[in-house]
Amino acid sequence: YDRLTGYFRARALTLAARGIEGLVRNNGRMRLLVGCTLNPPEVEAIAKGAECRAQVTAHLLANPLKPGNQREVEALELLAWMVANQILEVQVAVPCDEHRRPMPAQGIFHEKAGIIEDKTGDRLAFNGSLNETEAGWTQNWESLNIFRSWLGDDPRVAAEETNFAKLWSGESRHVITMPVPDALRDDLLRFL
């Protein structure tokens, strides 16, 4: 599952728990490219997960993230577990100028699209207004365009895949992308 989103909240993962269970069972992977809008507990969970792949559970218990309620605790634990077990890779996207310098307060990466491939090779792509947040999935009025490879939409699916690959690999001229721990080291998250 490849996903581009302007906003991400860990609680969105709990809404997709059944799908994530299937992803894990089938050795699937998720790549999430999110605008630099992560809140501090989520950045911390991702960073902790990336730094302690061998001992996630013990590390989380020893270093609580201070979320506001039990649902947030569970969402952040799931996020860190997915990162630590290499099921989820997260990168941040920061708009940049023509010299590839981040542009503070000049807009955000706000693209919203996704590509899902099943074990038979069928692919579904979507784009629209939906962010990867609990409110986006359950409360907001959103629009979504869906393209299915098995129904003749293969060119549209391929276009979404190409766009994702270009952004994920850092080949876009006006967006810098990098894994969250790198962003912490490079101080890019000050542009949140």
Q: Where does each model-flagged region fall?
A:
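PLD/PLD-like phosphodiesterase catalytic module centered on the HKD motif
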Residues: 2-192
